[in-house]
Curated annotation (Swiss-Prot):
Gene behind this protein: ffh
Annotated GO biological process: protein targeting to membrane; SRP-dependent cotranslational protein targeting to membrane
Keyword hit for Iron-sulfur: no
Protein name: Signal recognition particle protein
Catalytic activity entry: GTP + H2O = GDP + phosphate + H(+)
Keywords: Cytoplasm, GTP-binding, Hydrolase, Nucleotide-binding, Ribonucleoprotein, RNA-binding, Signal recognition particle
Superkingdom, taxonomy of origin: Bacteria
Subunit text: Part of the signal recognition particle protein translocation system, which is composed of SRP and FtsY. SRP is a ribonucleoprotein composed of Ffh and a 4.5S RNA molecule. Metal ions are essential for the formation and stability of the SRP complex. Interacts with the ribosomes, via ribosomal protein L23. Interacts with FtsY.
HAMAP family found in the cross-reference section: SRP54
Amino acid sequence: MFDNLTDRLSRTLRNISGRGRLTEDNVKDTLREVRMALLEADVALPVVREFINRVKEKAVGHEVNKSLTPGQEFVKIVRNELVAAMGEENQTLNLAAQPPAVVLMAGLQGAGKTTSVGKLGKFLREKHKKKVLVVSADVYRPAAIKQLETLAEQVGVDFFPSDVGQKPVDIVNAALKEAKLKFYDVLLVDTAGRLHVDEAMMDEIKQVHASINPVETLFVVDAMTGQDAANTAKAFNEALPLTGVVLTKVDGDARGGAALSIRHITGKPIKFLGVGEKTEALEPFHPDRIASRILGMGDVLSLIEDIESKVDRAQAEKLASKLKKGDGFDLNDFLEQLRQMKNMGGMASLMGKLPGMGQIPDNVKSQMDDKVLVRMEAIINSMTMKERAKPEIIKGSRKRRIAAGCGMQVQDVNRLLKQFDDMQRMMKKMKKGGMAKMMRSMKGMMPPGFPGR
C-alpha cells in the first residue's frame, strides 16, 4: 500500500533527519523532493501546494523540541501535516440514530460497491454486534443482486430480495419497512453503479436518498484512480449530501494520491479502506496511522488490533502450553502459524505495518510475496503426519516424495525445513525466557537489508 510514496518520502526524510541544524536551503531542497514525491503519487496539485506551504511555514524558524534534532523535528512536522491533510482523526459511522440506521452506498461502476456492502455488513455484525439487513437497488445489473445475496450468506447477514423488474425507490422502501418490522439495527443499501456522473442516474439516486433519508451516505471509490477519485467524489457530493468515503483497492495502489486528496477536495472524511478481496479486508481509516505508514514508521496499533481480532486465541494458548511442557515445536505448529499469518492479511500486509519497512531494498520486498506462504503450506500438506511430528526423519528419498507430491523442487523442501529450524530455535529461546536473545536472533534471521541487520 502506497509503496512508491513511502519509498520516496522515507529516502528524502532520512537524508534530512540526521542534520544537526536546518537551514532555509536544505529545507527548500527537501521540500522540492517531497513535492515531486507527492505529485508522482497523483496527489491533487492544490493539496500539494497547501501541504508544502504549511510545512515550510512551520519548519523555517521553528523552535526545536529539546529531545529532538532539527531533522527529526522536520520529519515530525511532515507527519503532522500529512495527518491534517487526511482529516486528523478516525470518523466512525453514525449509528446513533433510531434503528434501523440506514447506510446508502453510492459510486461509479467497478469501484467495489457491492463487495464493500458485504464487508461493511460483516464489520458491523462482528465488531459492533449489530443485526444487519442488506438490499440491492441495482436493477440494471441482475448479477449485482445475486452477488450481494451470496456475499450476505458468506458474512452472516440477512438479505432482502429484489428484482430487476422493480423500481429502485420501491425496493428500498420495502426493505426499510422490513427492517423496522423485524427490528434490524442497520439497513445497508447497494445502489446501481454509474459509468459517469450523468443526470438521469443522479436523479434516480436522489429519489432513493429522499425516500429513505439515510444517516450515512458513503461514496465508494477506487483508490487506483488517484486524484480522479477525489474529483468524482466532489461531483457526487454536489448532487448528494455525502457523509464519508470508502476507498477501495488500496492494496493495489502503490501511489496514494486518492487518500491524500479526498479530504481536501470534498471536505468529507475517508471512513474505511478496502485492503483486499476477502470479506474481512475492510479497515477503519485512521489518518495518524496511515501517515506513519506512508513515512515508513509502521502502524503498530493496527498490527496489535489485527493480532487481537484475527489470531485464534485457543490455538495460541495450546501452542504456549505445549512449549511450556517441553513437547517441542513441530511442523503442525509451523503450519498453524502460517495459516494465522494468512488470516492477518498475509506477509506483505504484516510487513507494511512494521516500523522501518521503508528502508528495505526493492529486491528484498519482492520476496515478501503471499504466494510464498501458499507454497510453504503445500509442502507441509504433502508430508505424512509422522513426518510433520518428527521433521528430523525427512531425508533424501522422503524429500523427493514430498517435492513430487506438491509439484515443487527438493530445494524448496530444504528451504522450508531451514526456515522451520530457525523458528524452532526461536521457540526454544522463548521457552527459556530469553526474550532479548530471541530478538537478536530474529535480526540475524532477517535477510540482508532489513532494518537492524
